[in-house]
């Protein structure tokens, strides 16, 4: 069904309070948007870090009397009579279908294709990973995922064990298995990611070779020939002592989810135990790889 959107501008400090006000007047959802497209990276767990100048956007049912909503909001101490706002009618769309229509097969490296499960593969002789990531997890379109997939495609993974630290949709672990790895282990803090990875592994016929764990359940003394972690620079630095022990001696490490400007600080956290390769950049992101000393 169609919706009505009400947008108002405020400071990051007041955004949460105005979000509550919109919900109280009938908004079915509220989102925050940066007015000036200023990036904010790595909020702490449980933290909603907002921009200094923030648009607060409420979504209302199409039958909502928006004049009444505005009249109520005018009594809010942060707004007042005649407060600046924009009301817009949104056309009805099947958002999931629109997203599916825009997700096409993509090639990474020489052998690997990531293909939506609802599309035909472009090359039946290639290494094809059939992916149904849902709306929340990786599809290969982000530069960091692409960097990791290209790295895996260039490795000889035959008979190897691979750990995907922060597995999301399972795209990296499953790609490793399809590229010849004997076993892959996926770890993620989100139970939905574990389920998405499990579903995608079954779709690709590799579920018997993929182990999936929440951090609290992962076995002690886990080791792998190859470890890949596509998360964020902050966690990569903080978890360096944990991640660094996962590769076997002379094992390989691949890290991404890192802005190019953050590469040096991440390298510093791993250089003691790894011989690092030159950093590879794509757009504003980068990949760090190395071998265990």
UniProtKB/Swiss-Prot annotation:
Entry EC number(s): 2.1.1.-
Designated name of the protein: Ribosomal protein L11 methyltransferase
Function: Methylates ribosomal protein L11.
Species this chain originates from: Citrobacter koseri (strain ATCC BAA-895 / CDC 4225-83 / SGSC4696)
Main localization of the protein described in the UniProt heading: cytoplasm
Pfam families assigned to the protein according to its UniProt record, in alphabetical order: PrmA (PF06325)
A Gene Ontology cellular-component term: cytosol
Family affiliation: Belongs to the methyltransferase superfamily. PrmA family.
Superkingdom to which the source organism belongs: Bacteria
Location of this chain's protein in the cell: Cytoplasm
Keyword annotations from UniProtKB, A to Z: Cytoplasm, Methyltransferase, S-adenosyl-L-methionine, Transferase
